[in-house]
Amino acid sequence: MDAGLSTMATRNGQSSARVKLRNNLLNNDIGNIDIRDETPISRNGNDSNINIQPSSVPQQQQQQQQYYRNGMNEAPIQAPLQQRQIPMQNYSQQQRQQQQYNFEYSNPHMNEIPLMQHNFTKPSLSNNRDNVNGKKASSFTQSSFSNFFKHKHQFGKSKKNTKGTGGGGDGDDDDEVILDDSANSDLTFNDIQTFGHKGGDKYGYGGDSTPIIPTLVTKDRGNMSNTEYRKYITNQRKTAMNAMAKQTKNGTLASLPPRAMSLQSFPNGNPLMQAPTPHPRFQPNKMVSANYSRSNSLMSGPPGQFRQPQQQRMLPMNNYNNHPGQFQNTPPVMPSGQQPPQQPRTLSLTNGPRYSPQNPRPFAGHQQISQRQQQQQQQLQLHPMSEGYRTMSLQSQNVPQGFNPWSPNDNDRKAVSMKQPISQSSISSKNNSAYSIPNVQNNSLTTFSPSSPTDATAMPNSTKQGSSPLKKQVNIDQPIENKGKLNVLQLSTPQQNELKEKERKLAEMEKSLREREALVEEKEKERAEKNTEANEEEEISHESDDLNLRPASALETGLKDLKLESESAVANRASLSTFSSTFSDSPSKQRIINTRTGMYKLENSTDINEYVTAQEFPSPGKYNSNSDNGEMNTTNEVDFDFNTSKRASLLQSIPERDPKRNVSDATIKRRESDGNGRRLSNVNISMNQENINNDTFLYKKNNRDGHLSAVSHMSSSSRRSFISNTLPLNIDSASESDNFVPHMDGSPSKTKSAPVSYDKDGMNASEEDFSFDNTLAKPYEPLYARRGDITSAGSTSGEDSSQPKMITISGEQLNLITENKELMNELTLVSTELAESIKRETELEERIRLYETNNSAPSFDDSSSVSFSDFEKELRKKSSKIVQLIQQLNDERLKRFIAEEQLLLQENGTKPSSMELVGRIENLNKLIDERDSEIEMLKGRLQ
């Protein structure tokens, strides 16, 4: 900068004055400039008539100012002149001007201008005028340099100077400021805390209380707060709006579109943004109109800049029927090739004529114009007119009615394609919804009634011009040979055929869906009929069966959780706390054989000591009946075929309880061969000596005492009554095997039938783990009901009769049923263990007795032996009575569970009603009576 000033000083020959001025500027902020000595600039002056001062110093200072500004990457600025006299109340503004001057003319050796680096000393009130007069300086240019800091925040520059109009402008320069995003015009909220009291009083405590409200931030926008950003954007928008208004007012630039409901007097739209037109040779004489404002505008017509002499020619009026009120305001003709302007929108209140551009298709190519369009263009040359106003227009002039060159004539009405027509609601400009093709189906007679160019009294009537209602809308107010046609759209023949094809496909699809629905209904009916027939056949086949109210006995329920397909299978219990292995070769079993008790203790993480007595079941036919040596041998039979075997549990039965259960082995085998529909395994307990220590029943030490605690609390009198009413056990092998195997095949000789008729799915359903979700519905398969009872009521649902209907119950109910089943399993297990212990005890006593008879030297006294034997007999009687009571308790509890399940099935619609059940019971009782009578008759004949 110093080198440049030195060079300039040498060239002009005024080095001392420039150096002095430069030093004054650097030392005293604005030097000795006094704005009172400035020469006023003419208001109407421009670059050519600026008053030149006699002295050449201001020109040099102007060059120096431009040099300073260009050194800081800013354009040279020329500000208009400020007033000559500065009153005392403007001291604060002058002080801020000096501060901003310090910002922009600080150390010239710095690349960037630091912010707020100067101390602002505020002079006292008595020295205000001296300070003001001392800080005035002569002008650098013909415009006042202090006028550059005229505005409050000094962020703008005169736009008139930017345009090159010189320093002369009007006095309304406050509105002609645009933003200058330079690096030197930063004043943010962060500057307030260090702005007001450097070297002086704190802000608000001194004589100057001028508010400092920073509203502009021109850089570092990433660190703005939301308040700063909003103020910045608001001020920027206001400044831009004022600049645009000034430009429009002065007429220097083209007008921009105002907002709707505007009361301004300048037009809407940019003349440069107009719709495209076809080739100019087809449009030698086109009608044009100026751009109009938007809806609800109160403008008074087209602007003056569009009313040029070559556009003021009016076309002749007598070329087309000369109807009254027609062509009263004929638009001026634009030169060939000039693009037409836009049309106003709906509900316009303007009173000037509106005309649409007369191009056949604005969005069509130049090479795609047909013969019909060329003929229409020829007609336009002779009969030019507009397309008409938009709908619901309130213009105050007569609107031309009649001829629309773009509506097809009578011969070409059917040949109008979808690409050719232009409705009245569409216009030629992209800004006013050009390229929009209205839907033909929505353009009914009522749709075109408000949008037609005719009056309400001149509504077009229907004619016999075709089948479509759109073809009938012809204006009949004019002669037939020259009648005006509406701009009616209709689909082309290919598109009509396409629509018909789509309708036909939809009809075929609907028809196919209806046929498919009918077919599904027929299949459901057939399936329901088959289910009904199968249920009837099954009911007939099971007429001899009684209600399945026979409770599951101990061994059957205990073995329900065993899988006997392989010897290495592990028991699957429903409860994890009672999980234990039941075979001797299970990997989860600790193989420590106790020869005294014959039990294996399992390794588990629970506090309950679980024991198991395991027995390897021999296959059928491998058992031995050793009756010669007097040992009690019974049959252990397990049938692994679940489709051809019967599954029954073994619960000790006192011989005096039910004499009908003493059945021979031959009867047992015959019933096994007859039972093909049930999965009942006849398992007998082996009393062989080598299998005494290996039993097949799960045994809980802690639970055994709990189940029998009620018996231990019985009074002595009740015990004596039990003993007196109980006979000793029968140790006969054949009778014991019969007593421990109650058979449930539904024969009339038994009193109660077995409640178990499981298939493989039922067994898997009974082995489900405990569910922790009590809210979701879960499928339930009945445990005690027969398949025939389930499917008879659910046959109407369309399911297969071979599978029972699956019902869904809540998780809470399912868990309750599962716990009831587990409770029955535990009770039957305990009762079976007790029965087996009594049986083993009886067997040991018989063996001891046989040994004593064979031994010549008894080891105890006869009297003591007799008393001991009597005690043992009484103990056996007591034990047998306990077992009998436990069995009765289990039976009653199981009956309750069966009744609850029947009620649950009935509530879910899978069981017949109670009336049906009562009727079935009566029929079965009658059938039993008839068979009993037949048996009596046959016995009488045999005798």
UniProtKB/Swiss-Prot annotation:
Modification N-acetylmethionine occurs at: M1
Keywords linked to the UniProt accession: Acetylation, Phosphoprotein
Acetylation recorded as keyword: yes
Basic and acidic residues: bias regions: 515-533, 655-677
Ranges of Low complexity composition bias in the record: 367-381, 417-433
Residues the record lists as Phosphoserine modifications: S553, S586, S619, S649, S681, S766, S771
Name of the protein: Uncharacterized protein YMR124W
Source species, domain of life: Eukaryota
Region (Disordered): 37-63, 152-177, 315-381, 397-472, 515-546, 616-639, 654-683
Basic residues biased stretches: 152-162
GO cellular component: cellular bud neck; cytoplasm
BP terms from Gene Ontology: endoplasmic reticulum polarization
